């Protein structure tokens, strides 16, 4: 079929949420003429649920996005109202930053960034169909009948894809926050042959700040010590007048109200059909599943400086409006609170992610990429990370350049994408530190060391950032080398000082680096013995030095594991392999191989239901059966 196109682009991105914004900024910054199409321009980078960025694992993803040249970290650093480092009492592998956002300012700032970006056209329009010829994307069709040509299309529709809002007995077609749902596009994705799933998520009610009795709650302030998501942000710009959050709890009365109205809860009445998030359950689900708990935490989170709306984190619900009011008034501090918005659930279609490659391109259609909640994830950060990778690979494909695949040992983004394309997901996927087997080398403090060079190679890291990175890396390398070259000897003067500080004396000569491996010796103590660096070091470099030195043995073991896995990742599996021709592999393994069609031995080994014996048989088969190459 010959199409008459009214406009032509290199890449078209459908949806301007957190995934779509990162995807479109990446493609345009890499030199591709890009269209970012959205149902509603006023909802660009909107936060329909929690007014925050970061958190456990997620905060590290934002740092990775920033290190690669993405925008989320810079944007939240300009628009937060509170910043807090989590898990400070635990090891460095699980520390992560979380910011409370001014949600309207966040969206406005991001929209301004998109509007200023060269090569990027922003358009309010509904995309109804993706045009495909001979298994390859050629463009899109709008609801008004316009046809736009494209060499690649990135679908980032979030929860709008056949979205339906559920509130008590009420259910109606809608995207998030009562925006339009994208129904025709959902139908057409299915017609293209993609396997579609149905998920559900929810959001809590918002209450009016001036109606809250804060005296009955516990204050949750931000940190005084400067921390940032972007490696380019300055400590001098760290916000001093942060806005606190507040902690309260449900109680037995709250639980009684929920239990007495479970028959009206869509979660239990059968109205909700989609699968909900395991790690962000509704309050009614929590009360039923954890009936022995006397109370559940609720955090009162301001949604910005210029609004009275307060997000009641932990109270996600789709109970009827009258029940929500009673529930709120049963909570300490909220006895007289005014409910400004009701909580609700939303069901939406997803593209089952086992149909994707690690580039986030669909296996079925060349040039068609998907990212974000469209792939079954939950969270703004997971969406933004996928959007960035999908956008990068869409641009690389258009330009005929090698694709970018982040491995599990490269980034949390790599862990997430590998989980999605290798294992799929039966529920909204959330990143957790426990999902990363190499988490000690995927830390908050070293995301730039891991990824900035990659961002530079693909054209997303500008000269200013690259220069700052080179200075930091040189300072780090030089100081590490210096600490490893200076020796402390167990002489009387040295040991007298060591003992004065309350530490065990030296029995053998050791380098300053070895001295720092002692749990009680920090960088400041070490340099008090050996003298300071040639130039003043930033606190973030000192933090990185302490972590790398104190955990060196564990880090080395992790890197050894990475090297072993790399060898398995380098063993490619032909695209045209006949899985039925391989004798002796288990039936379950054969079925999984057919469904996922892994690209490497490493990926095959991570598929659930596949055991080491199956991998051994597969490797023997490949060694004796040709060297066909995988092509897309």
UniProtKB/Swiss-Prot annotation:
Subcellular location(s) per record: Cytoplasm
Domain of life of the source: Bacteria
Primary location: cytoplasm
Keywords: Cytoplasm, FAD, Flavoprotein, NAD, tRNA processing
Pfam families in UniProt: GIDA, GIDA_C_1st, SAM_GIDA_C
Listed InterPro entries: FAD/NAD-bd_sf, GIDA_C_N, MnmG, MnmG-rel, MnmG-rel_CS, MnmG_C, MnmG_C_subdom, MnmG_C_subdom_sf
GO biological process: tRNA methylation; tRNA wobble uridine modification
Listed GO CC annotations: cytosol
Cofactor: FAD
A molecular function GO annotation: flavin adenine dinucleotide binding
Residues the record lists as binding NAD(+): 276-290
Binding site for FAD: 15-20, 127, 182, 373
Quaternary structure, from the entry: Homodimer. Heterotetramer of two MnmE and two MnmG subunits.
Physiological role: NAD-binding protein involved in the addition of a carboxymethylaminomethyl (cmnm) group at the wobble position (U34) of certain tRNAs, forming tRNA-cmnm(5)s(2)U34.
NCBIfam families tied to this protein: mnmG_gidA
Family membership: Belongs to the MnmG family.
Protein's name according to its UniProt entry: tRNA uridine 5-carboxymethylaminomethyl modification enzyme MnmG
Gene that encodes it: mnmG
